[in-house]
């Protein structure tokens, strides 16, 4: 991967930054043991101010995207197999998706799939493009494979919440939208005082169907390096071809649309970056101005223990 651009100066504080679960525990904000008893590994309970912060980030991200002209959408959290195979490869499906036993339904791994699926087998007037949607949803993923020490806590989990954005547009506009989408995520993180960078994925690292992709990474003061918090992808006409998403022009000519998607914010990983970058020497966590209206005016969170 090649670094495209860096936004904000990474800061290494002059005090030790604890692991994110330790920070959360200082606020009585996470219970992994109870979650393990209830659902197994890869789940969590968020409590108190940490749970409130989680909801605040989602609410802020929703309003952020609405203010940028996106239509807010609450999509289905389950999708049929013809939609699954239209938006991703079988290998990706097998590694990610949970199937509902006895039903032709899968739990979504991202709301991108159900938002893109909204347009299955449609012919859309060119004059109505682009369609720009943003949604909040829970996401469910198998997350197969071994996980390292840095993936404990809420870093890699089976259930999480995410604000997503998708675009359906004319082919000649897709690269313009690609740049707009990842810049939305960068702007969101910077508004919360979190340094980020973008990495362009090489062709060998691209998932099936993707034409171009960029990862957004946030700075971790504890690890003194960046870690992935989202990705933006241009899928060209690959999904549109599989799902039958067509466009009709003024001359009645029909052609395939282009589809794009991008993570606005996934709070579990974003919370890691947020807590580390806003942690103070006394253990309190500063609340950036943009989040204060969603936190009842709170300017900082104070540890409970």
Residues of each region from the PLM?
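TRNA-recognition modules of translation machinery and tRNA-sensing kinases, especially anticodon-binding
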Residues: 6-305
């Amino acid at each position: 991967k090649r670094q495209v651009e860096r936004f904000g100066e990474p800061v290494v504080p002059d005090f030790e930054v604890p692991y994110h679960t330790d920070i959360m525990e200082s606020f009585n904000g996470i219970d992994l043991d109870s979650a393990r008893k209830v659902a197994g590994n890869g789940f969590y309970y968020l409590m108190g101010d940490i749970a409130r912060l989680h909801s605040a980030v989602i609410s802020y991200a929703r309003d952020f995207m609405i203010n940028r002209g996106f239509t807010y959408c609450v999509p289905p959290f389950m999708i049929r197999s013809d939609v699954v195979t239209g938006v991703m490869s079988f290998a990706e499906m097998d590694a990610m998706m949970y199937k509902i036993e006895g039903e032709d339904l899968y739990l979504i791994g991202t709301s991108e799939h159900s938002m893109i699926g909204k347009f299955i087998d449609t012919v859309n007037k060119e004059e109505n493009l682009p369609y720009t949607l943003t949604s909040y949803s829970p996401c469910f993923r198998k997350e197969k494979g071994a996980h390292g020490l840095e993936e404990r806590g809420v870093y890699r989990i089976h259930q999480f919440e995410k604000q997503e954005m998708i675009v359906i547009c004319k082919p000649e506009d897709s690269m313009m939208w690609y740049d707009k989408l990842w810049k939305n995520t960068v702007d969101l993180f910077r508004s919360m005082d979190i340094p980020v960078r973008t990495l362009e994925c090489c062709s060998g690292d691209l998932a099936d169907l993707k034409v171009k992709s960029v990862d957004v990474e946030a700075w971790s003061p504890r690890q003194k390096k960046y870690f992935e918090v989202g990705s933006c992808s241009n899928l060209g006409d690959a999904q549109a071809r599989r799902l039958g998403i067509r466009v009709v022009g003024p001359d009645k000519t029909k052609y395939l649309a282009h589809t794009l998607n991008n993570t606005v914010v996934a709070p579990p990983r974003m919370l890691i970056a947020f807590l580390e970058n806003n942690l103070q020497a006394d253990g309190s966590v500063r609340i950036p101005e943009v989040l204060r209206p969603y936190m009842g005016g709170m300017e900082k969170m104070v540890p409970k223990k």
